[in-house]
Amino acid sequence: MATQSISKIVLAYSGGLDTSAIIPWLKENYGDCEVIAFVADIGQEREDLVGIEQKALRSGAASCYVVDLRETFIKDYVYPVLKSGALYEGSYLLGTSMARPLIAKAQVELALELGADALCHGATGKGNDQVRFETTYTALAPQLQVVAPWREWDLRSREALLDYLKGRDIPTTATLEKIYSRDANAWHISTEGGVLESPWSPANQDCWVWTCAPEEAPDQPELVTVGVEKGEVVSVNGVAMTPFGCLQALNALGTRHGVGRIDIVENRLVGIKSRGCYETPGGTIMMAALRGVEQLVLDRDSFQWREKLGQEMSYVVYDGRWFAPLRQSLQAAADALADAVSGEVVIKLYKGQAIAIQKKSVNSLYNEAFATFGEDDVYDHSHAGGFIRLFSLSSRIRALNSAKQ
């Protein structure tokens, strides 16, 4: 059990069962230390924040700070990753992965402001989040102690946590009936557990929270025009908005048409495979818009580099290395490529799909005169022969050498 001397500790608090139990547990096991509850508002469900300060105080916290990070989350964390085209293992838009460094950074800043000597999170010992939180803590405030209750206590079940709170007369609205584990922010919502623990069991409707089932979506497609400047979405249907505002507008459209659902088995950083259902409606539309502009403005080599860049960025962000030099280096490359990614894209939303059907950009490299197959073709076909001979020279040499043997 605890051996460190801690007088004041800042807890990343969600108001859920786990972190509600952590508050009294910290006071009992760390010398009746002062526990400060920190709540990051990153666009999670509004009902999760109602009365959260009172809930923290009833659990024994000395105070509770709720910090609005919604715009910061989208502008400074989501948009930079979106520029790179990062998709973890080809499909996951990194909703939880991008949020954790921001939460941990704001938590560290509050701890330093209040003169705390320790930080605490409620991530389990099997998941990725413990790594993401603590890697950020180490990068920004290595002098602060870190407490991870799930790696210390013997409360291993939901029932044990409920009994723990009941024994201390701490009220909670949690029950034993919870089946799924969910994480939500402005960008996405994830669902794990329950029926999803068997990869052979299809996800049922309870696994989806935000989005309409594609087969039940409207029978008529809906078109949305997305404005992009330097790799960032700046307007929806001609209306300029903040990053968070753009996401809210696209989320509303995407959920109605069942856009942004994925059901995947992913490789966790800690070596365990896990299955989850992710819903990222607005983000999926944004990704389609950016890729549409990229098709016009990036040459072949730049596009291939962006593909490699996105893959590497996905691993760095997923692993929680947001403040590492590698992530910053990758970001510089992504920003350079995105400098030309400006334009407008019309996205068709229909039965779970978001398809770019019209696109334009002042930086477009697409030239109709060169692309046409008509008689007014400005491309001299005879030039292709010399290019092909040089392009295939290594193959020719290899074949000639083989013939001599």
Swiss-Prot record:
Q: What is its EC number?
A: 6.3.4.5
Entry GO CC: cytoplasm
Q: Where is the signal peptide?
A: none
Q: Where does ATP bind?
A: A12, Y13, S14, G15, G16, L17, D18, T19, S20, A40, G122
The cross-references to Pfam families, in alphabetical order and at most eight, read: Arginosuc_syn_C, Arginosuc_synth
Under InterPro entries, the record lists: Arginosuc_syn_C, Arginosuc_syn_N, Arginosuc_synth, Arginosuc_synth_CS, Arginosuc_synth_type_1_subfam, AS_cat/multimer_dom_body, Rossmann-like_a/b/a_fold
Give me the residues that bind L-aspartate, please: T124, N128, D129
- Keywords for this protein: Amino-acid biosynthesis, Arginine biosynthesis, ATP-binding, Cytoplasm, Ligase, Nucleotide-binding
A GO MF term? argininosuccinate synthase activity
Where does this one sit in the cell? Cytoplasm
Q: Which reaction does it catalyse?
A: L-citrulline + L-aspartate + ATP = 2-(N(omega)-L-arginino)succinate + AMP + diphosphate + H(+)
BP terms from Gene Ontology: argininosuccinate metabolic process; L-arginine biosynthetic process; urea cycle
Q: What class of enzyme is it?
A: ligase
Give the family per the record. Belongs to the argininosuccinate synthase family. Type 1 subfamily.
Subunit composition?
A: Homotetramer.
Q: What is this protein called?
A: Argininosuccinate synthase
Species name = Edwardsiella ictaluri (strain 93-146)
**Species lineage, top-down?**
Bacteria, Pseudomonadati, Pseudomonadota, Gammaproteobacteria, Enterobacterales
